[in-house]
From Swiss-Prot:
Gene: thrS
Enzyme class: ligase
Binding site for Zn(2+): 334, 385, 511
InterPro entries (UniProt xref): aa-tRNA-synt_IIb (IPR002314), aa-tRNA-synth_II (IPR006195), aa-tRNA-synth_II/BPL/LPL (IPR045864), Anticodon-bd (IPR004154), Anticodon-bd_dom_sf (IPR036621), Beta-grasp_dom_sf (IPR012675), TGS (IPR004095), TGS-like (IPR012676)
Record protein name field: Threonine--tRNA ligase
Main location: cytoplasm
Catalytic activities: tRNA(Thr) + L-threonine + ATP = L-threonyl-tRNA(Thr) + AMP + diphosphate + H(+)
Biological process (GO), any one: threonyl-tRNA aminoacylation
Protein family membership: Belongs to the class-II aminoacyl-tRNA synthetase family.
Gene3D superfamilies the record matches: 3.10.20.30, 3.30.54.20, Anticodon-binding domain, Bira Bifunctional Protein, Domain 2, Threonyl-trna Synthetase, Chain A, domain 2
SUPFAM superfamilies documented for this protein: Class II aaRS ABD-related, Class II aaRS and biotin synthetases, TGS-like, ThrRS/AlaRS common domain
Subunit composition and interactions: Homodimer.
Pfam family, one: HGTP_anticodon
């Protein structure tokens, strides 16, 4: 006689075991129609799941995040159903959900074209429109393997052989004649899977291992209703317009090439932005009392063995040999900073020591994961490490948080998601130490009045951490900043200080990054601003142009005046119509265009226009120089008179 407790505390008693869907029907026909699955005692279950004992139950509908994920997972099965009908010889691998959608890896003896993808999507919609029921069946391990052997599915058999215990009872989901294996839950009926779009095909190795066969990965997105799908596709279109790779090429910021995969060739204009970011962060380092250091590019493997990187991180490290010694190019800066700390005896009076570096790091990321500036192999971190006592953790973390928000606000990022990652199961140190560390981070967040999400067990083995994710104008999250406590590395590298009682103690190390990878941050702000960088970051801040050849000398004079006060200025003296020049520099996103005609020469002025088409009128060169200098000095986000 199960008693079901609902989220509002009310209870319903049944005289027999009852399914999730039957409970929903007992509550009301409308809820039953909307039921996708249920959360029974906190665990997601299919709508057909039978509850035999007293339990708590939350009904999952398309309005819930869980409901949307289940829809997406079922759309992956729908994709499998459709592709099997169109290409009977295809071998199905895995089809999980991802952010905003799903994918399925398939093994097919020819490359899928866009026409194929369109046909698969059309068949998916035809199948979904029949509103067929999805039937779940529990079978023995051997029955599951026999099923997939008969169906010629070697990848499903491999999953059973390598990942599922022989005593398990796998769940097979039947989509009419198509069968897939999954932990679930899935939708009870395909009427929930009507709003989807297949997006692209990419290569993916089976098991993510380059030694295995390359499969074709079909990506798709799925939503609860037509409106959500349309809004998402609109956001994708806007994101495509803002793609930093496209804008980077149009603005001649950088390029990448096959001979140096994942490495950036910075062009003059892109490097100008890079250096401006470094200059800005340096002003903040001074303000927050950091010292700036520079560590070596590579170090002997002996050091990396001490840190544990050689044992746990070797696949991501580039190595080289010389004179019978093996070296690793640094993937991170922290071991080098500990070496600097270790030079000379340190006292508790010297702490905290805040050590910052624009460190050039390299990681051997898989080639398939590389993506413009967002995922590279060679990058520069605005990295810092703070050596302090346990008593100083809260105050130092508070200072780090203030610095994070100080810097992000300059770029217009005010919507920041904060996450606190706590102790994992496998960790070093005592529970008391972790209690103090987590309490210190939580207190620092509270001190700054920040709401945060706790990520249980997501901390590193050597300490808890705070993550800061920027939400951009398209609602995407970019995880950039981290404040990470480390109780392990200083001890592994023999870092000590003389405590107040004259004993030797190991300092706590706080890893602190704000921009993270500068390369990636440039990619983020390129997309955030759509290439319309604020004046202080713009590679060229103003272009001075003539109307006819007779104004050329005046244009040169104006440009020199502006350059002499530190502004980045170019001239355009081409024998082209001024409207053509304005259009061209508008496309180049130059903040200000200064037009010099006979009238401006006679008045000793310049006519100023913005890249958004605003006519600001005429100014003396001195007036305009002061306006632009003030904008640069204060790092304003908007141009003059810009909404």
């Amino acid at each position: 006689m199960p008693i079901i407790t609902l989220p509002d505390g009310s209870q319903r008693q049944f005289d027999r075991p009852v399914s999730v869907l039957e409970v929903a029907q007992d509550i009301g026909a409308g809820l039953a129609k909307a039921t996708i699955a249920g959360r029974v005692n906190g665990e997601r279950r299919d709508a057909c799941y039978v509850i035999e004992q007293d339990a708590t139950l939350e009904i999952i509908t398309a309005k819930d995040e869980d409901g949307l994920e289940i829809i997406r997972h079922s759309c992956a099965h729908l994709l499998g159903h459709a592709i099997k009908q169109l290409f009977p010889d295809v071998k199905m691998a895995i089809g999980p959900t991802i952010e905003n959608g799903f994918y399925y890896d398939v093994d097919l003896d020819r490359s899928l074209t866009q026409e194929d993808i369109d046909a698969i999507e059309k068949r998916m919609l035809e199948l979904a429109k029949t509103n067929y029921d999805v039937v779940k069946k529990r079978v023995t391990w051997q029955e599951a393997r026999d099923t997939f052997e008969k169906r010629g599915e070697p990848y499903k058999m491999a999953i059973l052989d390598e990942n599922i215990e022989r005593t398990a009872t796998p769940a097979l989901y039947h989509h009419l004649e198509y069968i897939d294996m999954c932990r679930g839950p899935h939708v009870p009926n395909m009427r929930f899977c009507q709003h989807f779009k297949l997006q692209k095909v990419a290569g993916a190795y089976w098991r993510g291992d380059s030694k295995n066969k390359m499969l074709q990965r079909i990506y798709g997105t799925a939503w609860a209703d037509k409106k959500q799908l349309a809004e998402y596709l609109t956001r994708l279109e806007e994101a495509a317009k803002r793609d930093h790779r496209k804008i980077g090429k149009a603005l001649d910021l950088y390029h990448m090439q096959e001979e140096a995969p994942g490495m950036v060739f910075w062009h003059n204009d892109g490097w100008t932005i890079f250096r401006e970011l470094e200059t800005f962060v340096r002003t903040k380092l001074k303000q927050y009392d950091y010292q700036e250091v520079k560590g070596p590019f590579m170090m002997d493997r002996v050091l990396w063995e001490k840190t544990g990187h050689w044992q746990n991180y070797a696949d991501l490290m580039f190595t080289t040999q010389s004179e019978n010694r093996e070296y690793a190019i640094k993937p991170m800066n922290c071991p080098g900073h500990v070496q600097i700390f270790n030079q000379g005896l340190k006292s508790y009076r010297d702490l905290p020591i805040r050590m910052a570096e624009f460190g050039s790091c390299h990681r051997n990321e898989p080639s398939g994961s590389l993506h413009g500036l967002m995922r590279v192999r060679g990058f520069t971190q605005d990295d810092a490490h703070i050596f302090c006592t346990e008593d100083q953790i809260e105050s130092e973390v508070t200072s780090c948080i203030k610095m994070v928000y100080d810097i992000y606000s300059t770029f217009g990022f005010t919507n920041i998601a904060v996450k606190l990652s706590t102790r994992p199961e496998n960790r070093i140190g005592s529970d008391e130490m972790w209690d103090r560390a987590e309490a210190g981070l939580a207190a620092a967040l509270a001190h700054n009045g920040l709401e945060y999400e706790i990520q249980e067990g997501e901390g590193a083995f050597y300490g808890p951490k705070i993550e800061f994710a920027l939400r951009d104008c398209l609602g995407r999250e970019w995880q950039c900043g981290t404040v990470q406590l480390d109780f392990a590395l200083p001890g592994r590298l023999d870092a000590t200080y003389v405590a107040e009682d004259n004993s030797r103690k190991t300092p706590v190390m706080i890893h602190r990054a704000i921009l993270g990878s500068i390369e990636r941050f440039i990619g983020i702000i390129t997309e955030e601003y759509a290439g319309f960088f604020p004046a202080w970051l713009a590679p060229t801040q103003a272009v001075v142009m003539n109307i006819t050849d007779s104004q050329a000398d005046y244009v040169q004079k104006v440009a020199k005046q502006l350059s002499d006060v530190g502004l980045r200025v170019k001239t355009d003296l081409r024998n082209e119509k001024v409207g053509f020049k304005i259009r061209e520099h508008t496309l180049r996103r130059v903040p200000y265009m200064l037009v010099c005609g006979d009238k401006e020469i006679a008045e000793g002025k310049v006519a100023v226009r913005t890249r958004k088409g605003a006519d600001l009128g005429t100014f003396t060169v001195e007036e305009f120089a002061e306006i632009l200098k003030n904008q640069v000095r204060s790092r304003e986000l908007k141009l003059l008179n810009e909404e």
